[in-house]
Swiss-Prot record:
Coiled coil: none annotated. It comes from Bacillus anthracis. The keyword Transmembrane helix does not apply. This is Uncharacterized protein pXO2-61/BXB0075/GBAA_pXO2_0075. It comes from the Bacteria. The keyword Heme does not apply. InterPro entries: Histidine_kinase_N.
Length: 136
């Protein structure tokens, strides 16, 4: 799995601008959202964090600070947290599509899908949890 994981990290790093550009075309960002620029910055930061997570340079707990920040921005913007979930899933789907392009064998694919799901599930869970905790 290490080889395919390195390939995925290198692919995402080398094509980060294109990845973000493609992601921006599919995300939901309201015109009235005071954090619309910050949404893009958060996406860039989370892509870097995802790469670091795959390289085992950070743990899942280290993205919880970002989760709290995003939750606060969504509350302040008075938007539904579902938009964040949608935007996060757009990124996850893009990464899964890239993974299939790299043509891993079944065992590598399953192991990487597990890592991808762990990262994005943790991110969504802690952001939504923090959103409702802060909103209360």
């Amino acid at each position: 799995m290490e080889e395919i994981k390195c390939l995925l990290c290198r692919y995402l790093k080398e094509r980060q601008e294109k990845f973000i550009s493609d992601w921006k075309k599919k995300v939901i960002i309201r015109e009235r959202d005071p954090y619309k620029e910050e949404i893009i910055k958060n996406g860039e930061h989370l892509l870097s964090a995802f790469i670091m997570y795959l390289k085992e340079e950070i743990s899942l707990q280290e993205i919880e600070i970002t989760s709290k920040k995003i939750a606060r921005e969504r509350i302040d913007a008075k938007v539904n947290i579902a938009e964040f979930i949608h935007n996060t899933n757009v990124a996850k789907i893009e990464i899964m599509n890239i993974l299939t392009l790299l043509n891993p064998d079944l065992q590598q694919y399953q192991a990487l899908v597990k890592k991808i799901n762990q990262f994005f599930d943790h991110l969504i869970y802690y952001t939504v949890h923090s959103y409702y905790e802060q909103k209360a």
